[in-house]
């Protein structure tokens, strides 16, 4: 008989694992649990999560509880009689009563090489640190965050131009491939879960808008990584003439720069560039507040510069916060 699976996930990159499970005859997805519909867009119309939309298309029953702390939601989940749960960025930490429902527990897809980068923003963390490789981990969930035993891992190179959005999608697609083979082997007892080396653990945080504020006293290398690590959220942002300016793409063009204060806008043979605490950062694509992204050279042509104008105010703060993944 097929393995009975309940799938918990919400964002677009969690759709690939769901589709792979539904298409595999070894598995029966008996239900999907996802976040409730939320208002979105300018009209604030109620919008289902990408996982809910996929589940309805695939003909899988869907549960959308406000929280799995609700006893009624826990009872609905238990009524599905799953053998195992699969979690892919569901959006809520599972409590012990939920963890106890499937006999085989819950298998999680985590987009890092655990124990590195536990927590909610592992892809951004790897990019920001300039790692040469990253990967995906298939693991069992326990009561602590991303600390459970490992079933399988897949390592992939981390390209120097990687951005969090596309890389997250790629890792979950790879994770879907690893998952469908690992899950069957785990259910048959052919895999022995391996405990993590907790002494090697590193952690990531829930990102807020403030994390994306550029401090131009930082090295150019780190600021360039910010433009990729914080795409799509929260973005790498600075202030220019009293309004936010998002730096979408940039390139380090010098290890050192002229003797000008960090944040100073400079014209170079490579186009507009900004002095940093260590190096010169050429701007490639920017997005002024309320406008579409445009080449930085076009943005610069529209400016009348007075000498020594500077970008940024590292003490500025923006409101709000949300998770990357």
Curated annotation (Swiss-Prot):
Residues the record lists as binding (6S)-5,6,7,8-tetrahydrofolate: 112-115
Enzyme class: transferase
Positions of transmembrane segments: none
Gene Ontology molecular function, alphabetical: methionyl-tRNA formyltransferase activity
Alphabetically ordered keywords of this record: Protein biosynthesis, Transferase
Domain of life: Bacteria
Annotated S-S bridges: none
Pfam families hit by this protein: Formyl_trans_C (PF02911), Formyl_trans_N (PF00551)
EC number: 2.1.2.9
InterPro entries with a match to the protein in the record: Fmt (IPR005794), Formyl_trans_C (IPR005793), Formyl_trans_C_sf (IPR037022), Formyl_transf_N (IPR002376), Formyl_transf_N_sf (IPR036477), Formyl_transferase-like_C_sf (IPR011034), Met-tRNA-FMT_C (IPR044135), Met-tRNA-FMT_N (IPR041711)
Known catalytic reactions: L-methionyl-tRNA(fMet) + (6R)-10-formyltetrahydrofolate = N-formyl-L-methionyl-tRNA(fMet) + (6S)-5,6,7,8-tetrahydrofolate + H(+)
GO cellular component term, pick one: cytosol
Its biological purpose: Attaches a formyl group to the free amino group of methionyl-tRNA(fMet). The formyl group appears to play a dual role in the initiator identity of N-formylmethionyl-tRNA by promoting its recognition by IF2 and preventing the misappropriation of this tRNA by the elongation apparatus.
Record family assignment: Belongs to the Fmt family.
HAMAP family in the cross-refs: Formyl_trans (MF_00182)
Protein name from the UniProt record: Methionyl-tRNA formyltransferase
UniProt source species: Roseiflexus sp. (strain RS-1)
Lineage of source species: Bacteria, Bacillati, Chloroflexota, Chloroflexia, Chloroflexales
Gene that this polypeptide is encoded by: fmt
